A protein has these predicted regions:
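HotDog/MaoC-like acyl-thioester-processing domains
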Residues: 27-59, 148-149, 159-198
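Short structured motifs
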Residues: 77-83, 137-144, 170
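Catalytic strand-loop segment that frames the active site of acyl-thioester-processing enzymes
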Residues: 78-108
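A short mixed-secondary-structure module that forms the rim of ligand-binding clefts
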Residues: 96-127
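Hydrophobic beta-strand-centered segment that forms part of the acyl-chain substrate-binding groove
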Residues: 123-159
């Protein structure tokens, strides 16, 4: 409780009625303790998210993370994904345009982008679910809006906090090219259900 009132004091300092009793250094130290407590309290339970948070601080770490994902699900290796951002509610993954993912007209192949969409949706689902739940893709609706003539980035969002019982969950994904033009729009349907009791 005292920590909360100290935080309130930081927020209100300089405003009428603010409590200026504590020196600013004490308030900063108090705030850092609060931040640590908040982080601990809401620490991710997903092993995948913990691994990302540990490895994402460096280029090598992000490369190792992508390799690990490719090892767990080998088909994703075919697009050589580069993870940009990963957390509950958001996953952003980049695909570099190169010969191996091009079609006969020199643009990024439709199925490579579908693969990218499924990867982004699967990863955001994985890190957003509580440990008591599991998921598997059940379907995909995809629209190819423009030819992709450059690297592309997929963004999957899953704005959900409550999970209970078996359900189908649609995960929207957008893919943009290097100029920000949307080239693909997809919804990946995930079947989410409780893990069996062990």
């Amino acid at each position: 409780m005292q920590r909360c009132s100290a935080l309130k004091c930081v927020a209100l300092r300089g405003f009428p009625g603010a409590s200026p009793e504590l020196p600013i250094s004490d308030l900063i130290a108090e705030r850092q303790q609060l931040d640590w407590l908040t982080i601990t309290k809401t620490a991710p339970t997903s092993p995948v998210l913990r691994r990302w948070q540990k490895l994402s601080k460096s280029t090598l770490g992000r490369w190792l993370f992508a390799r690990g994902v490719g090892r767990a699900a080998p088909y994703f290796k075919t697009i050589t994904p580069r993870f940009v951002e990963l957390g509950p509610a958001l996953c952003r993954v980049r695909l570099r345009k190169r010969r191996a993912v091009e079609n006969h007209i020199g643009t990024v192949h439709a199925i490579a982008m579908a693969n990218l969409c499924e990867l982004a949706a699967g990863m955001v689902t994985e890190v957003s679910l509580p440990p008591s739940m599991r998921w598997i893709p059940r379907g995909m609706t995809i629209e190819y809006l423009q030819p992709a003539r450059s690297d592309v980035t997929a963004t999957a969002r899953l704005d959900r906090n409550e999970w209970s019982g078996a359900q189908n969950v649609g995960v929207p994904v957008t893919v943009v090219d290097s100029t920000g033009v949307e080239v693909v729009r997809a919804v990946i349907t995930m079947y989410v259900s409780p893990r069996p009791q062990q």
